[in-house]
């Protein structure tokens, strides 16, 4: 691995470059591109009896899948570190992203008949599709459950609470159904920053959009009332959607204890059903899917069946870097970090170039991130690059730099720019 760290005398800017020497020829043949298109006048109403007052809009976001082939010559050329020719990847157009604050996902028009024919989808009157909000206190396993249900890692997972900041949309599809999951931030009782307030708005927006709600609790802890979760997570909905309470981490307690806690939740909580699971090992996941499926309305899919998320690649790149920060650093530092992808360029004759900035509150946090002689940042960049390459299925050149923006977690303008006002941007 070639490493080229540089630090200025004033510590105002620090960069770390991480790249690998040998290219992997096993490129993924598909790239996902985000496009927003206006549909024709054939919008279909999607079971209006379960939409809780929502209206369908005449525009939708479609994920176009473009097949790319790589010849042996292109693979050989990709091994060269040629920085001269740089082509902007075409998912960075922020205008092509769906504004969640102005146009909730649940209001998107269904795929029309023409699109279904394009995707090889045969209309099925028994097909179910709908939205599911996954809510709960911090560190109860919401992201792990969502990843298990989708079948691959969409949300980052660490052992620290409040890792998830956005509502992450993941799609679980089969020929008979399509479940669209919202993995949400953990419910915060005492909000310390403006960021916390905006994160709770993401939770409520997910619940408003949902056909049903899955509430997670930690089975290892003493059963408590879930009113705080319902208050913050659902707000004052006039009509509550169907609710499932999931007791996660059942693998860590004895069967007899599980039965007692299950009985308590059934007696003292206002939910439709209680199911114990182990999200880590996948135990009970099929029971959760079966319950959700029984609550989803009949209708065609919202997305192509081979799509697992609508978020752009840049968003997942930023999340991977943030996950590594949570795993490597302790105390307040991970929570003070915001990760933005400044540049993502495809280079036909070289590795793709990704430039990332990590924003922190204070200069002291910046010094911790960088570490002595840049060693900590080097470790971070290397770990992030390896996971990014695994996610993209290609080799990349990753540049990481650290910047200070004081009190960014209290700056509403910056928070909205970073996507916390409800709009997932390209980061």
Swiss-Prot record:
Primary subcellular site in the record, as a coarse category: plastid
Region G4, annotated ranges: 248-251
Keyword Plastid found: yes
Gene Ontology process terms (BP): ribosome biogenesis; rRNA processing
G2: annotated segments: 162-166
Positions of GTP binding: 136-143, 183-187, 248-251
KW Nucleotide-binding (keyword) present: yes
Gene Ontology CC, one term: chloroplast nucleoid
Region listing for G3, in residue ranges: 183-186
Annotated organelle transit peptide span: 1-39
Keywords, ordered alphabetically: Chloroplast, GTP-binding, Nucleotide-binding, Plastid, Ribosome biogenesis, RNA-binding, Transit peptide
Region G1, annotated ranges: 136-143
Region (G5): 277-279
Domain Era-type G: 128-298
Localization per Swiss-Prot or TrEMBL: Plastid, Chloroplast stroma, Chloroplast nucleoid
CDD domains listed in its UniProt record: Era, KH-II_Era
Gene Ontology MF: a single term: mRNA binding
Family annotation (Pfam families): KH_2, MMR_HSR1
Domain KH type-2, chain residue ranges per copy: 329-406
Protein family according to the UniProt entry: Belongs to the TRAFAC class TrmE-Era-EngA-EngB-Septin-like GTPase superfamily. Era GTPase family.
Function: Nuclear genome-encoded probable GTPase involved in ribosome biogenesis in chloroplasts. Plays a role in 16S rRNA maturation in plastids and may contribute to the assembly of the small (30S) ribosomal subunit.
Protein name listed in UniProt: GTPase ERA-like, chloroplastic
Species this protein is from: Arabidopsis thaliana
């Amino acid at each position: 691995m070639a490493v080229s760290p540089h630090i200025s005398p004033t510590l105002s800017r620090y960069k770390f470059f991480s790249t690998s020497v040998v290219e992997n020829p096993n490129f993924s043949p598909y790239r996902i591109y985000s496009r927003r298109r206006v549909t024709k006048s054939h919008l279909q109403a999607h079971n209006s009896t379960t939409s809780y007052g929502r209206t369908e809009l005449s525009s939708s976001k479609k994920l176009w899948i473009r097949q790319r082939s790589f010849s042996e010559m292109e693979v050989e050329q990709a091994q060269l570190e040629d920085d001269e020719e740089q082509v902007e990847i075409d998912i960075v157009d922020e205008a092509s992203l769906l504004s969640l604050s102005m146009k909730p996902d649940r209001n998107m028009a269904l795929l029309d008949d023409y699109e279904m024919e394009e995707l090889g989808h045969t209309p099925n009157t028994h097909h179910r599709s709908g939205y599911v909000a996954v809510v709960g206190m911090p560190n109860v396993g919401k992201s792990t459950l969502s990843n298990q249900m989708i079948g691959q890692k969409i949300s980052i997972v660490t052992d620290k609470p409040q890792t998830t900041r956005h509502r992450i949309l993941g799609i679980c599809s089969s020929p008979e159904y399509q479940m669209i999951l919202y993995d949400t931030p953990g419910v915060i009782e005492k909000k310390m920053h403006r960021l916390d307030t905006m994160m709770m708005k993401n939770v409520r927006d997910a619940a408003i959009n949902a056909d049903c709600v899955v509430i997670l609790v930690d089975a290892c802890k003493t059963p408590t009332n879930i009113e705080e979760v319902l208050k913050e997570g659902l707000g004052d909905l006039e009509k509550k959607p169907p609710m499932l309470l999931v007791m996660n981490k059942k693998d860590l307690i004895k069967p007899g204890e599980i039965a007692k806690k299950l009985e308590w939740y059934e007696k003292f909580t206002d939910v439709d059903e209680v199911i114990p699971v182990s999200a880590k090992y996948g135990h009970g996941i099929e029971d959760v899917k079966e319950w959700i499926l029984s609550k989803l309305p009949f209708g065609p899919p919202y997305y192509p069946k081979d799509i697992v998320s609508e978020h752009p690649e840049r968003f997942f790149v930023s999340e991977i870097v943030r996950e590594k920060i949570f795993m490597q650093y302790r105390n307040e530092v991970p929570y003070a970090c915001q990760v933005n992808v400044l540049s993502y360029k495809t280079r036909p004759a070289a590795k793709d170039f990704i430039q990332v900035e990590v924003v922190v509150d204070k200069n002291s946090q910046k010094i911790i991130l960088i570490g002595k002689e840049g060693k900590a940042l080097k470790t971070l960049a290397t770990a992030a690059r390896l996971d990014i390459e695994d996610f993209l299925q290609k080799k990349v050149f990753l540049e990481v730099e650290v910047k200070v923006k004081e009190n960014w977690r209290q700056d509403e303008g910056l928070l909205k720019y970073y996507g916390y006002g409800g709009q997932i941007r390209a980061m």
